[in-house]
């Protein structure tokens, strides 16, 4: 575990029990506008899918089955697991205005709308056609996705994290903090204040005495 991952655990957002997940990251400014404090939104029914059965990930090549872009293929750029949503890059878009003011109508920009997991299918790398998949184990014991039509393994893509690092391919450099150094306990709690610890470490002797203070 890297130091950035340890710091991310400390800044984890605590969500209320009736929180409704959306396209924005929980705790962000856009999310707070959708879920203002003190309000209760109607609960959304979501099909329960076990974590071990979920098979769509960021970077996957999928084909859309429904909607205006049915038959088109694209790359998954976002997965909202709590709503069974996936977002396909450049497809299933709608247009909206941003930066609207009194004197300016705003700039029209495209925005990808989410799709349910059953509205897309993974693309088989053998023939570039949509296919059903199932989880199987290889001879080495690795759990992989396999096309039910061709039997071809569909590997999981390596997707960078928010800080741009791909954990599977990252190699620590000379300026990176190792896991052992990050987890090493170097602080020993004491009853002295910080100032007293610094004075003791640097050999500073306090010879001054408090003078009388008069208030008028």
Curated annotation (Swiss-Prot):
SUPFAM superfamilies, alphabetized: Translation proteins SH3-like domain
Annotated transit peptide: 1-9
Location of Phosphoserine modifications: 24
Residue span(s) of domain KOW: 56-89
Localization in the cell: Mitochondrion
Alphabetic keyword roster: Mitochondrion, Phosphoprotein, Ribonucleoprotein, Ribosomal protein, Transit peptide
One GO CC term, this protein: mitochondrial inner membrane
One Pfam family per UniProt: ribosomal_L24
GO BP of this protein: translation
Matching InterPro entries: KOW (IPR005824), Rib_uL2_dom2 (IPR014722), Ribosomal_uL24 (IPR003256), Ribosomal_uL24_CS (IPR005825), Ribosomal_uL24_KOW (IPR041988), Translation_prot_SH3-like_sf (IPR008991)
SMART domains reported for this sequence: KOW
GO molecular function, one term: RNA binding
Primary localisation category: mitochondrion
Annotated Gene3D superfamilies: 2.30.30.30
NCBIfam families in the record: rplX_bact
Known partners and oligomeric status: Component of the mitochondrial ribosome large subunit (39S) which comprises a 16S rRNA and about 50 distinct proteins.
Family note: Belongs to the universal ribosomal protein uL24 family.
Protein name: Large ribosomal subunit protein uL24m
The organism's taxonomic lineage, starting at the top: Eukaryota, Metazoa, Chordata, Craniata, Vertebrata
